[in-house]
């Protein structure tokens, strides 16, 4: 197994990813936080948004990724509540990236399982700056990766490749006509939770607050499941070492959680449904992949 990648290849991949992300970062909301009228994607009627118009007036990214997903949301919303339509399309988008999710999850779980062993190797050569020691440490780490069939760089690639779908579903869920004008249990899909909580708390704002709390709980659970599964397969002494290693991971987890909650209160309510469903699907996928691919190895 070869883990050596030239700096040139890494730079090219990084540049490609940045360009792709920037291509998808089209401004779709006004100063009030609501979707701009010209950015709404309509399924039919006088305002019907065609694939050609999307490609011509916006970008290839919007035409290839955003438009199909938004129209799927609109299509399903004809036969079910818009919230259920968002849930269904979110699940479908997860299925599209499932092969990559399996690869990334398996590799990540293995990395967490061997983290205590990696820490031992690094501690063994701590303070040794000579070239021979560095090469010896790299070789020991390489042998460990090979033993558990881990390719760290492939894990990074598998994590980044689904990004276009994530950005596309992010926009599609907000821009679909059925979402902009839809409701679920009196919750307006285009409403900003923070606005509703601060101005209409006693009438409807409390419902948005409950939605945000549910979002926070599901996101937290989804982020902690991989750590729990990885530690479950460790020996007792390895668990102690893993707890130390997880301190930094926990800091990132809590930072990410706070960021998502903060973003959810200032974005259309439809995004909260998307994040809740994504978190639940992610947690279920992680558990199933662990049982099917990791535990059986």
Regions from the language model: what does each represent?
Residues 2-297:
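Helix-loop-helix
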């Amino acid at each position: 197994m070869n883990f050596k990648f030239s700096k040139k290849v890494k730079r090219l991949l990084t540049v490609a990813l940045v360009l792709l992300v920037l291509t998808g970062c089209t401004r779709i909301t006004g100063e009030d936080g609501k979707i701009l009228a010209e950015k709404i994607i309509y399924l039919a009627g006088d305002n019907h948004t065609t694939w050609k118009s999307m490609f011509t007036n916006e970008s290839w990214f919007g035409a290839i990724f955003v438009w199909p997903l938004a129209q799927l949301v609109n299509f399903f919303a004809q036969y079910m509540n818009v919230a259920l339509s968002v849930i269904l399309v979110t699940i479908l988008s997860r299925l599209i990236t499932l092969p990559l999710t399996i690869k990334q999850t398996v590799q990540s779980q293995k990395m967490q399982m061997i983290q205590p062993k990696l820490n031992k190797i690094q501690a063994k050569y701590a303070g040794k700056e000579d070239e021979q020691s560095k090469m010896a440490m790299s070789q020991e780490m390489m042998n460990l990766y090979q033993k558990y069939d881990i390719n760290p760089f492939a894990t990074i690639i598998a994590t980044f490749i689904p990004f276009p779908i994530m950005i596309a579903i992010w926009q599609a869920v907000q821009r679909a006509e059925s979402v902009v004008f839809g409701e679920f249990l009196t919750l307006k899909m285009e409403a900003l939770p923070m606005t509703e909580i601060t101005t209409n708390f006693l009438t409807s704002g409390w419902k948005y607050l409950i939605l945000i709390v549910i979002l926070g709980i599901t996101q937290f659970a989804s982020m902690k499941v991989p750590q729990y599964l990885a530690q479950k397969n460790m020996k007792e002494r390895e668990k102690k070492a893993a707890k130390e290693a997880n301190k930094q991971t926990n800091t990132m987890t809590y930072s990410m959680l706070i960021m998502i909650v903060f973003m959810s209160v200032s974005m259309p309510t439809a995004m909260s449904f998307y994040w809740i469903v994504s978190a639940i699907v992610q947690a279920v996928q992680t558990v199933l992949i662990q049982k099917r691919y990791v535990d059986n190895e």
